[in-house]
């Protein structure tokens, strides 16, 4: 396989010219880890907090550096804590004038649980950070589809997840895109959640689009990462659900076993929604596995 790749590159590139680097090979896991550490160091990141504002500033800074078209979906959510200002941030790459151009969305939330002392190194920081590394990889890359990087806000429930509490940002944006007709152009939606876990194991989420999951499995197999994907199943309420309800093919790329499992712990592991969700639980290797696999999947779907 390596020899064939080198042969193809030799024929594709003029003498002395470097072969173009693929999207998935442009992913920098060291930078993704550094972004994760930086966001986690901001501390608590519930909407309105200093850490939340610093995270927003970092997202805007990176997107502007990488040449994205930056948009915000801002609104006031009615929550059990009262009105909360919410801002989804979207970085768009390779936008053409063709109104029929397909869209692919890579998403993750950047808020944290309303819990004093909770920094969410994995649950919030890792997903926000890997999207920043995706922005760096996409800078200068050409794709047929528009690629949207979406940072959702107020994913976490105030009390407990139900139809009215939790997923505030994704519910609002999905409803907006369905109402204005954009949802029909979305080729797919990948949500990344808690993907920095040192003991990485991405679940096969049973409500997600099986065809898109199969593309992810193919990409993982090609890269030698199959052992990290779809070895167990789970049904979960997450930011992909409002998009599924809007008719968008969506997959939750989630590690749903964070730490030890058992009756003494949270249903998603001992570190989930725990103040022990800190940087020592996050791995650069896990970010590399997920980042390269997801970007290779996007390349496959863009052909």
Specify the residue positions occupied by each region the protein language model found.
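Bacterial N-terminal signal peptides
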Residues: 1-10
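A non-catalytic alpha/beta surface segment that caps or lines the substrate-entry region
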Residues: 34-94
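Structural recognition of the beta-strand scaffold that forms the well-ordered cores
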Residues: 72, 90, 103-107, 148-151, ...
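Active-site-adjacent substrate-binding region
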Residues: 78, 188, 197-303
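Proline/glycine-enriched tight loop/beta-turn segments at coil->beta junctions
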Residues: 96-103
């Amino acid at each position: 396989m390596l020899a064939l790749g080198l042969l193809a590159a030799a024929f594709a590139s003029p003498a002395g010219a470097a072969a173009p680097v693929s999207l998935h090979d442009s992913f920098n896991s060291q930078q993704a880890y550094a972004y994760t550490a930086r966001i986690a160091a901001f501390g608590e990141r519930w909407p309105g907090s200093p850490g939340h504002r610093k995270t927003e500033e970092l997202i805007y800074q990176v997107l502007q550096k990488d040449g994205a078209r930056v948009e915000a979906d801002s609104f006031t959510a009615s929550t059990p804590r009262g009105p909360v200002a919410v801002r989804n941030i979207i970085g768009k790459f390779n936008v053409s004038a063709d109104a029929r151009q397909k869209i692919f969305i890579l998403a993750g939330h950047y808020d944290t649980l309303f819990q004093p002392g909770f920094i969410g190194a994995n649950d919030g920081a890792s997903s926000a950070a890997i999207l920043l590394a995706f922005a760096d990889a996409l800078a200068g890359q050409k794709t047929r589809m528009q690629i949207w990087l979406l940072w959702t806000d107020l994913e976490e429930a105030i009390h407990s997840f139900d139809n009215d509490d939790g997923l505030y940002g994704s519910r609002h944006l999905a409803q907006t895109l369905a109402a204005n007709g954009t949802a029909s152009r979305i080729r797919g939606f990948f949500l990344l959640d808690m993907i920095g876990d040192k003991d990485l194991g991405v679940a096969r989420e049973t409500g997600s689009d099986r065809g898109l999951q199969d593309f992810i499995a193919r990409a993982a197999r090609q890269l030698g990462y199959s052992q990290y994907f779809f070895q167990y199943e789970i049904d979960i309420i997450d930011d992909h659900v409002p998009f599924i309800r809007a008719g968008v093919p969506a997959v939750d790329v989630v590690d749903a076993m964070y730490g030890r499992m058992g009756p003494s712990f949270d249903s998603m592991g001992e570190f989930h929604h725990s103040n022990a969700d800190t940087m020592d639980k996050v791995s650069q290797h896990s970010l590399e596995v997920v980042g390269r696999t997801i970007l290779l999947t996007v390349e496959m779907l863009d052909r």
